[in-house]
UniProtKB/Swiss-Prot annotation:
Protein's recorded name: Peptide chain release factor 1
PANTHER family in UniProt: LD18447P
Superkingdom of the source species: Bacteria
Summary of the function given for this chain in its UniProt record: Peptide chain release factor 1 directs the termination of translation in response to the peptide chain termination codons UAG and UAA.
Native organism taxonomy: Bacteria, Pseudomonadati, Chlamydiota, Chlamydiia, Chlamydiales
Compartments it resides in: Cytoplasm
Stretch forming the signal peptide: none
Cited SUPFAM superfamilies: Release factor
Length: 359
């Protein structure tokens, strides 16, 4: 890792020289690219300096402990050493993630589709909990979320919830959320205190950029139907045919949207989801054909693959793909997902480049 850090520090010096050249402003695209690279390399430099500082403090504390005689001071130093070692481990993992080479698609917006699986109303309630978790995570990361479609259940959860997420490194950290999420807890309606198991399926679809030539949809291949939106009743039920259903005839992909009162807005949202699903289908097809690439991923990404279990009675969350178990489910549900997502990104990178330790 030290060799990679030194390479990055040398590259940072080069980038700083390039950015300081006044002629760079005549090429906005190049300047933008260098600015992003400078920001990433600066993060690596700061993380490396933090590690060096933490190592020095740890070294000094251990040196002091070796000669200390006072029991109170010994206890303080031992506590400081333990905290310092934990901090050093955390900083090292942070640096390891920063050293992962950026993927051109890292910053792509994604569309997340959450659906209630087995478990009926309890599964729908957990969809609602997951929606809240991802919104909180997005807030922590400085991302933007947009509701594209939502189908509420009778008890306040969601049968289906589709959201768009945009921001820096969105795809990088959310792509491994695809799969089946299993929840084990006692439902509020359970009178005997028995633990029930439910499931939620999540799809994560990278949203094609506007200039993405890979996804071309011919208007002639679309069938667009409009209908009256259905709601829970009352004054907010739309009396016009504002809901939109779009069918892509060649693939059979169907997308409906009725959240907006404007037919035009519903159509625009439905088209975004449609493009993402068609792009995803093409990517899945290519990856299935390239088995070598598939084996280098964290799990298959198949929506039927059970990837994670949330056990509320034990306050435990387990990601089955990398064998990671944490006993802080309460914090995870409050949006502190980085401890899982960063581990998944690191694992995927090690597999891809053949650095995975052999058992």
């Amino acid at each position: 890792m030290e060799v990679k850090v030194l390479e990055c520090l040398r590259r940072l010096e080069e980038v700083e020289k390039l950015i300081s050249d006044p002629n760079i402003f005549s090429n906005p695209k190049e300047y933008s690219s260098l600015s992003k690279e400078h920001a990433r390399l600066s993060e690596i430099k700061n993380a490396h300096e933090s590690i060096l500082a933490a190592k020095k403090i740890l070294h000094d504390d251990k040196l002091a402990l070796s000669t200390e005689k006072d029991p109170e001071m010994i206890a303080m130093l031992e506590e400081g050493i333990q905290g310092g070692e934990e901090s050093l481990e955390r900083l090292s993992k942070q640096l390891e993630n920063l050293l992962i080479p950026p993927d051109p698609d890292d910053d792509l917006s994604v569309i997340m589709e959450l659906r209630a699986g087995t478990g009926g109303d309890e599964a729908a309630l957990f969809v609602g909990d997951c929606v809240r978790m991802y919104h909180l995570y997005a807030s922590i990361k400085g991302w933007q979320c947009e509701v594209l479609s939502a189908s509420e259940s009778d008890l306040g959860g969601y049968k289906e919830y589709i959201m768009g997420v945009s921001g820096t490194s969105v795809k990088r950290f959310l792509q491994y959320e695809a799969g089946t999420h299993r929840v084990q807890r006692v439902p509020e309606t359970e009178t005997q205190g028995r633990v029930h198991t439910s499931a939620v399926t999540i799809a994560v679809l990278p949203e094609p950029a506007e200039d993405d030539e890979e996804v071309f949809i011919d208007e002639k291949d679309l069938r667009i139907d409009t209908f009256r939106s259905s709601g829970a009743g009352g004054q907010h039920v739309n009396v016009t045919d504002s809901a939109v259903r779009i069918t892509h005839i060649p693939t059979g992909v169907v997308v409906s949207c009725q959240d907006e009162r404007s037919q035009h807005k519903n159509k625009a949202k439905a088209m975004r989801v449609l493009k993402a699903r068609i792009r995803d289908a093409e990517v899945q097809k290519r990856e299935q054909e390239a088995s070598a690439m598939r084996s280098a991923q964290v799990g298959s990404g198949d929506r039927s693959e059970r990837i994670r279990t949330y056990n509320f009675p034990q306050n435990r969350v387990t990601d089955h793909r990398i064998g990671l178990t944490l006993y802080n489910l309460d914090r995870v549900m409050q949006g502190e997902l980085d401890m899982i997502t960063t581990a998944l990104v690191s694992h995927a990178h090690r597999q891809l480049f053949g650095h995975e330790e052999t058992n």
